[in-house]
A protein has these predicted regions:
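Glycine-rich phosphate-binding loops of nucleotide-dependent enzymes
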Residues: 1-251
Length: 251
């Protein structure tokens, strides 16, 4: 059974069909990419999947259950985590503390009680701290754990953001332009981290403009144009698709 099923998804803004009859599936263990130029509907699609927007029609099934119309936190608890194009670090917090925020969704004490350091939260807080530190080690940025997150290099902040998303223990990770703002070396490193995340059993769906990264790490690619799906295939086939080459990749 597919982990994520998108069926005839449609979202209108007045007379604009931002997402128009889009269908595809994401299988467990895949890295699947969604590409297209600005205005293609990629961000709107992610907002529909993660609960930030409600579709005008169509269905989204996650683990076999329909989730369209549910609140983002309800979808997150079910196992879907998301990162954003613009990195959102909590100012005044270290890299480790930023990751711990993501981990609190798995806790029972509640974020506020933990922030107030209530004694009965201490055992759980230690477990959250240990797990968050392990994620920083996994993504090879443990040496930055106690550094203010906003002072880190852009590529390091992206890794912290990935660790924070993984702290939620998702089965599906939505990555919104993970290479945005990164140089060629940082982009290659992010690609390596995404592949490592997939190898750990987390399915990945990403939106990305960097075609080299997409072609290198994706198992399948969905191509959008003005809100409609115009292609879905293996990277090698997408590279040979004449319509995709003409509209998106350049001849």
């Amino acid at each position: 059974m597919a982990l994520l099923e998108v069926e005839k998804l449609h979202r209108r803004f007045g007379g604009l069909h931002a997402v128009n009859d889009v269908s595809f599936q994401v299988e467990p263990g895949q890295i699947k990419a969604v590409i297209g130029p600005n205005g293609a509907g990629k961000t709107t699609l992610f907002n529909l999947l993660s609960g930030a927007l409600v579709p005008s029609s169509g269905a989204v099934r996650f683990h076999g259950q329909e989730i369209q119309g549910r609140q983002p936190h309800e979808i997150a608890v079910r196992g879907m985590a998301r990162t954003y194009q613009n990195i959102k670090m909590f100012s005044g917090m270290t890299a480790l503390e930023n990751v711990m925020v993501g981990r609190h969704i798995q806790g029972k004490a509640g974020f506020l009680a933990s922030m107030l350091h209530a004694p009965w939260t201490w055992p759980e807080e230690k477990a959250i701290r240990d797990k968050s530190m392990a994620l920083l080690e996994l993504l090879e940025i443990a040496d930055c754990a106690h550094t203010p997150a906003t002072s880190l290099a852009f590529g390091q902040q992206r890794a912290v953001e990935l660790a924070r998303a993984l702290a939620m223990e998702p089965s599906l990770l939505l990555l919104d332009e993970p290479a945005a703002g990164l140089n060629i070396y940082e982009t290659a490193e992010v690609g390596r981290l995404i592949t490592r995340i997939r190898d750990l059993g987390v399915t990945v769906l990403l939106v990305e403009h960097d075609m080299s990264l997409v072609m290198d790490i994706s198992d399948e690619i969905v191509v959008l144009c003005f809100g409609q799906k115009i292609a879905e295939d293996l990277p090698s086939a997408i590279q040979q698709n004449s319509e995709v080459i003409k509209i998106y990749l350049g001849e």
